[in-house]
Amino acid sequence: MTDKIRTVQGKVISDKMDKSFVVAIERTVKHPIYGKFIRRTTKLHVHDEHNEAKLGDVVEVRGCRPLSKTKSHTLVRVVEKAQA
């Protein structure tokens, strides 16, 4: 049985924790009455074993078992490094 694990891309907005960072994931949703598309943001706490991701990087993350009270995602790869 092969299940495709869902991965999402987002931007690192905080990397002050050791082996963790916060990523913001933007999505667009349609307003139920007016029909206008609105940007919504979700913040996720992500586990980063080797402290690879830095502030401003675009990263790919996937869900995993709960690692702490707020952390239940892990880093897959850094898609794009932030401008220095």
Curated annotation (Swiss-Prot):
One GO cellular component term noted in the UniProt record for this chain: cytosolic small ribosomal subunit
GO function term, MF aspect, one: structural constituent of ribosome
Entry keyword set: Ribonucleoprotein, Ribosomal protein, RNA-binding, rRNA-binding
Pfam family, one: Ribosomal_S17
Highest taxon, organism lineage: Bacteria
Disulfide bonds listed in the record: none
GO biological process: translation
PANTHER family tied to this protein: 40S RIBOSOMAL PROTEIN S11 FAMILY MEMBER (PTHR10744), SMALL RIBOSOMAL SUBUNIT PROTEIN US17M (PTHR10744:SF1)
Self-association state and partner proteins as the record states: Part of the 30S ribosomal subunit.
Function: One of the primary rRNA binding proteins, it binds specifically to the 5'-end of 16S ribosomal RNA.
Membership in a protein family: Belongs to the universal ribosomal protein uS17 family.
The protein's name: Small ribosomal subunit protein uS17
Species of the source: Histophilus somni (strain 2336) (Haemophilus somnus)
Gene designation: rpsQ
